[in-house]
């Protein structure tokens, strides 16, 4: 399995735990900077590597009038400031070849959303930025189907790939997590990250927005670590009830603070056993 180097740490076999975390969307510059500072301090306390995550545009909101974020230009300015002021690696979503090119020149990691993971032009544009590319497995794909996505990336000259499992469609307005997908995707040669927050979503389950079962985030995160996941993706917020996106499925900073040492201990135990 390929080892993906991010700043002064790496994602892959026998590497320390890495977690991507942050508010789902950039709500304001002040809010985003405070979130980054809080998470940086929290993760340093437990000696866990953090990749800060937030989106400049939530382009796939359920309703047309839902909050989407500050947009590409302003959002990237804020994320670049976080990278420079806090020394954090940053990951953000891209939705078009043009966005991939622009965001890839600013952010160390760009992410292909699950709904867009088969868009060839987007994949190739992301590959050609030279950035690390985190690709979410579509809810509609089998784990082994990601091999075709990988080949597209590699054909674009980029093998700095992180695969992300964020659940699989299970009837209407529901997702299920099949932990077999983690080792199956790892066999494709790249590290696998498990998205524990989007996996508890009820897509469109509240009519004009998605619902979710936040109480299952820790259970799925621990199950994924037990299955050998190389990384976790956990969107977080200082006050989930006030979150402007995915309020039902983001983790409270306070809960994340309590769970980080548990995640780390479990991850290290599994690594010692050679998973």
From Swiss-Prot:
SUPFAM superfamilies for the chain: Aldolase (SSF51569)
Pfam family, one: DAHP_synth_1
Localization annotation: Cytoplasm
Keyword terms, alphabetized: Cytoplasm, Lipopolysaccharide biosynthesis, Transferase
EC number(s) on file: 2.5.1.55
GO terms of molecular function: 3-deoxy-8-phosphooctulonate synthase activity
Source species of the chain: Protochlamydia amoebophila (strain UWE25)
HAMAP family, per database record: KDO8P_synth
Name of protein: 2-dehydro-3-deoxyphosphooctonate aldolase
Taxonomic lineage: Bacteria, Pseudomonadati, Chlamydiota, Chlamydiia, Parachlamydiales
Pathway the protein takes part in: Carbohydrate biosynthesis; 3-deoxy-D-manno-octulosonate biosynthesis; 3-deoxy-D-manno-octulosonate from D-ribulose 5-phosphate: step 2/3; Bacterial outer membrane biogenesis; lipopolysaccharide biosynthesis
Coarse class of the protein's main subcellular location: cytoplasm
């Amino acid at each position: 399995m390929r080892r993906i180097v991010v700043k002064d740490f790496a994602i892959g076999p026998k590497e320390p735990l890495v977690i991507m975390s942050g508010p789902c969307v950039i709500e304001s510059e002040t809010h985003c900077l405070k979130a980054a500072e809080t998470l940086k301090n929290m993760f340093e306390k437990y000696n866990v590597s953090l990749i800060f995550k937030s989106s400049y545009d939530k382009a796939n909101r359920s309703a047309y009038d839902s909050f989407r974020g500050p947009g590409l230009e302003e959002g990237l300015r804020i994320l670049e400031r976080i990278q420079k002021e806090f020394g954090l690696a940053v990951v953000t979503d891209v939705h078009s070849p043009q966005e991939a090119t622009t965001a890839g020149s600013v952010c160390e990691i760009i992410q292909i959303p699950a709904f867009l993971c088969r868009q060839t032009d987007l994949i190739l544009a992301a590959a050609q930025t030279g950035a690390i590319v985190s690709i979410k497995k579509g809810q509609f794909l089998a784990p082994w189907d990601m091999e075709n996505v990988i080949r597209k990336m590699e054909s674009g000259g980029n093998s700095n790939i992180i695969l992300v499992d964020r659940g699989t469609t299970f009837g209407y307005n529901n997702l299920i997590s099949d932990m077999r997908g983690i080792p199956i995707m790892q066999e494709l040669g790249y590290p696998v990250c498990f998205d524990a927050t989007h996996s508890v979503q009820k897509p469109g389950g509240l009519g004009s927005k998605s619902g979710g079962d936040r109480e299952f985030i820790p259970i799925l995160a621990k199950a994924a670590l037990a299955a050998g996941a190389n990384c976790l993706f956990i969107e977080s917020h200082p006050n989930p009830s006030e979150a402007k996106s995915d309020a039902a499925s983001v983790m409270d900073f306070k809960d994340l603070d309590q769970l980080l040492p548990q995640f780390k201990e479990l991850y290290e135990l599994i690594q010692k056993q050679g998973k």
